C-alpha cells in the first residue's frame, strides 16, 4: 500500500494515501496514468479498494465536458465494485473486507426535506462521485458510507457495477410509477439501459414490449424477457398500438415523435424518460383528456437501490457485460463511443 506520512504543525501524524488512477487533462483527452493523494478519512466515510468499474455514457459526457462542469484532471468512473478497506469512526453498518457497490452519488446532507423523506438522490447539497471529485478509474475511492451498498451473496461481483447507475436508473421508474405485474410496459431502446429494463420488468411479471429501430435486436430482446417487439424503422409501426401501454420507458438518447408514443399510452399512462433526449415537444390535449403524463428520473435513493439489489439477488438478474482491463481503458471508451458495447462495459483493475 502506497502512502506518505505527513507531519502536521500540531505534531500529530496522519497518513496521506496515494491513489493510482487514469485521468484526462483536457476535454476529450486520452486517459493517462495519474496519481493523487487522499487526506484523512472522514468519520462518516468508507474507503474502497476498486476491483471493477463500469463505463457509462455519463463518463463520456463528463470526459468531453458536454455539461460544462467537468474539472480537470478528470478521473471518470461511477459504477464501482470493491472491498471496504477503511471505515470512518461513525460508520457501524459496514465491515472491513465487505464487497460494496457505489454509483453516481457519493454524499448527501441527510437533513434536508428530500433526505428526510427518503429521496437522498434529490439532495440539492449532495455530491456526486465524478463531479468535482475523482471517480472509480482508480485503485481506491471514498464515499459517504450511506452510498456504499453491500452486495448480496448471489450478485455477481464482476458484472454488478452497472447496476449502480444504469440499473437503478431503469429500476427506479418501476417503483416510482407503482408498476404492477398486470401492467403492460414498453421499453424504447435495447441498449445498456434498455436490456436491464426488460430483465427487471419481465421478472416483475409485466407484459413487456421492446421497441427498437434495429430489427436485429428482436432475438436478444426476447432472450432478455420481452414478450413482443416493435420495429419502428417503419414510421407507422406504432399505429396499431393505440391505448396499449401503462408505461412507456424511453431509454434511448434520441429525440422521438413524442405524440405517437403518447398515443400508445392507456388513459392514466406515463411516458417516462431516462435517456438524455434534448427536448420533448408534444401536444397537450391528449395528456389532459387521457390524464396521461410525461416525466423522468435519474438514479434512486438508498432504499430503492437496496430493493433493486435484493430483487436481483432473488431473480438472478445481472447486466450483460464486456470486460476490459483498466490498462486498456482508452480502447474500452472508444468501443462504447462507437456504439459497439454489448451491453455494458466493465473495467477490471489491473494496476500494478
What is the role of each PLM region?
Residues 11, 16-19, 213, 259, ...:
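C-terminal hydrophobic helical "lid"/dimerization subdomain
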Residues 35, 108-188:
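NAD(P)H dinucleotide-binding glycine-rich loop of Rossmann-like/cofactor-binding domains
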Residues 37-53, 66-113, 152-155:
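Glycine-rich beta-strand-centered segment in the early N-terminal region that forms part
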Residues 184-190, 202-260:
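Adenosine-nucleotide cofactor-binding segment
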Residues 194-195:
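N-terminal Rossmann-fold NAD(P) dinucleotide-binding loop
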Residues 265-266:
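Helix-to-beta-strand junctions that scaffold the AdoMet/dcAdoMet cofactor pocket
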Residues 269:
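Glycine-centered, small-residue-biased loops immediately flanking beta-strands
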Residues 276-290, 303-307:
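Rossmann-fold NAD(P)-binding glycine/threonine-rich loop
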Amino acid at each position: 500500500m502506497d502512502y506518505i506520512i505527513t507531519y502536521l504543525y500540531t505534531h500529530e501524524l496522519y497518513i496521506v494515501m496515494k491513489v493510482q488512477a487514469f485521468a484526462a487533462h483536457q476535454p476529450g483527452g486520452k486517459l493517462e496514468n495519474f496519481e493523487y493523494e487522499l487526506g484523512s478519512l472522514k468519520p462518516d466515510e468508507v474507503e474502497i479498494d476498486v476491483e471493477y468499474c463500469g463505463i457509462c455514457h455519463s463518463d463520456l459526457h463528463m470526459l468531453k465536458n458536454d455539461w460544462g462542469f467537468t474539472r480537470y484532471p478528470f478521473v471518470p468512473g461511477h459504477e464501482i465494485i470493491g472491498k471496504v478497506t477503511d471505515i470512518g469512526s461513525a460508520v457501524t453498518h459496514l465491515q472491513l473486507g465487505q464487497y460494496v457497490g457505489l454509483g453516481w452519488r457519493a454524499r448527501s446532507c441527510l437533513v434536508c426535506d428530500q433526505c428526510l423523506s427518503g429521496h437522498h438522490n434529490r439532495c440539492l447539497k449532495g455530491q456526486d462521485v465524478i463531479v468535482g471529485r475523482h471517480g472509480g478509474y482508480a485503485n481506491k475511492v471514498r464515499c459517504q458510507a450511506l452510498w456504499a451498498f453491500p452486495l448480496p451473496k448471489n450478485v455477481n461481483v464482476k458484472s454488478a457495477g452497472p447496476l449502480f447507475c444504469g440499473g437503478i436508473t431503469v429500476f427506479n421508474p418501476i417503483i416510482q410509477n407503482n408498476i404492477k405485474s398486470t401492467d403492460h410496459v414498453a421499453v424504447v431502446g435495447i441498449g445498456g439501459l434498455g436490456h436491464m429494463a426488460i430483465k427487471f420488468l419481465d421478472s416483475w411479471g409485466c407484459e413487456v414490449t421492446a421497441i427498437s429501430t434495429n430489427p436485429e435486436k428482436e432475438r436478444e430482446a426476447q432472450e432478455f424477457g420481452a414478450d413482443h417487439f416493435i420495429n419502428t424503422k417503419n414510421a407507422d409501426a406504432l399505429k396499431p398500438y393505440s391505448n396499449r401501454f401503462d408505461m412507456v420507458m424511453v431509454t434511448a438518447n434520441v429525440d422521438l415523435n413524442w405524440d405517437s408514443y403518447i398515443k400508445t399510452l392507456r388513459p392514466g399512462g406515463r411516458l417516462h424518460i431516462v435517456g438524455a433526449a434534448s427536448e420533448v415537444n408534444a401536444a397537450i390535449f391528449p395528456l389532459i383528456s387521457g390524464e396521461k403524463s410525461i416525466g423522468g428520473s435519474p438514479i434512486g435513493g438508498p432504499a430503492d437501490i437496496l430493493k433493486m439489489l435484493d430483487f436481483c439477488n432473488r431473480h438472478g438478474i445481472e447486466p450483460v457485460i464486456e470486460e476490459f482491463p483498466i490498462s486498456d481503458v482508452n480502447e474500452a471508451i472508444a468501443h462504447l463511443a462507437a456504439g459497439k458495447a454489448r451491453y455494458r462495459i466493465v473495467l477490471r483493475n489491473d494496476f500494478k
